[in-house]
Amino acid sequence: MSANSHFHSTHESHYQCAVCSSIDANPNSLAVNYQCLADGSVVGGFHVLPRHQGYTDLLHGGIASSLLDGAMTHCLLFRDIQALTAQLDVRYHAPIELDDHVTITAYCEGERRGIYQLVAQLLVNNEVRVTAKGKFIRPKEA
């Protein structure tokens, strides 16, 4: 089964996601399309529009962190692992401006005692602007 067809079966767990759902499923979604690469890492793209700003002409920091969190989540979803963000440490290195085209990347560093460690970054013109490290855990069965 390919990563993309495999993804569709797990994506239903959050089909109205504010970051990655289609505009049809959630009109307020950022509608980011993440792709799984052969090495298991994830890449996506995002165009910064005026509605995404916090400070004048700059991408809102909360949206930046959501893009990173979404990419890390997809690293796990593509592996058929549904996990929740337990910790997200974000570093803002340089601002992202309106009309920037952002490349989003993420990969899984590993898993220890049921905790997945992931890393993600936002780049503009191959320059790192924002980085994050995250820890994810599987939800307990109800």
Predicted regions and their residues:
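Short histidine-centered catalytic/ligand-binding loop motif
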Residues: 48-62
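Non-catalytic linker/capping segments at the edges of enzyme domains
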Residues: 1-51
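HotDog/MaoC-like acyl-thioester-processing domains
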Residues: 1-15, 96-98, 109-142
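Hydrophobic beta-strand-centered segment that forms part of the acyl-chain substrate-binding groove
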Residues: 71-103
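Short beta-strand micro-motifs enriched in acidic
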Residues: 35-37, 107-111
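Residue-level recognition of well-ordered beta-strand positions that form the cores
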Residues: 45-47, 89-91, 105-107, 121, ...
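Active-site helix/loop of acyl-thioester processing domains in fatty-acid/polyketide metabolism
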Residues: 41, 58-83
